[in-house]
Amino acid sequence: MITIGITGGIGSGKSVVSRILLTLGIPVYDSDSRAKWLNDHSPVVRQALTGLIGSDLYENGILRRDRLAAAIFSSGDLLEQVNGIIHPEVKKDFCQWRSECESDLCAIESAILFSSGFNSLCDTVIRVDAPEKIRQERAMARDGSSAETMRQRMLSQEREQSLAKAGADHTVLNAPPHLLVPQVVRIIETVRTKRPNPPDRL
């Protein structure tokens, strides 16, 4: 099975590309939503996070994300430790999901594909891009955030975006006059064409 990574900055249109792949019959793993699910339901994650931060991090069995964010904000090195807990569990969850896929291709969508190391699970990576102004406008309309809040979020992603720009195999442009669907379809055709032939059976 060939694994495709999908990444891009906020407002770039990663989820749109994921939906295109789904319409092409390619299953897509949403690492963000699965990470949130694991934060709430994985005993491994819960035990490690409460051991690191405190038992009041969970309320009625659900992670209080505001408390986690406050703890990370108050401690410079805590984010790396939290990621060290969550990312390995997401990788395990993805590998289990992939093993159950009945398809020649599958994909994983992640805004932090490279900094998390998820790119090591991929055979090829698609980076979704758009001009910064368009990305900001899209994200503000979607999230209802202020321009300053969105600017800070985009600044926080600069390192990841540099890694993605250097490491991605394909880039699609999700802004006029570029049409997104034909770009994605061409990449999938290329990936399928270049896949290695199975060995001859004796």
UniProtKB/Swiss-Prot annotation:
Known function: Catalyzes the phosphorylation of the 3'-hydroxyl group of dephosphocoenzyme A to form coenzyme A.
Organism field: Porphyromonas gingivalis (strain ATCC BAA-308 / W83)
GO molecular function list: ATP binding; dephospho-CoA kinase activity
Chemical reaction(s) catalysed: 3'-dephospho-CoA + ATP = ADP + CoA + H(+)
Domain spans labelled DPCK: 3-202
Record-level GO cellular component terms: cytoplasm
BP terms from Gene Ontology: coenzyme A biosynthetic process
Associated pathway: Cofactor biosynthesis; coenzyme A biosynthesis; CoA from (R)-pantothenate: step 5/5
EC top class named in words: transferase
Region (Disordered): 138-161
EC number(s) given by UniProt: 2.7.1.24
Compartment list: Cytoplasm
Chain positions recorded as ATP binding sites: 11-16
Family of this protein: Belongs to the CoaE family.
Pfam family, one: CoaE
Alphabetical list of HAMAP family matching this protein: Dephospho_CoA_kinase
Keywords noted in UniProt: ATP-binding, Coenzyme A biosynthesis, Cytoplasm, Kinase, Nucleotide-binding, Transferase
Name of the protein this chain belongs to: Dephospho-CoA kinase
Superkingdom to which the source organism belongs: Bacteria
CDD domains, per the entry: DPCK (cd02022)
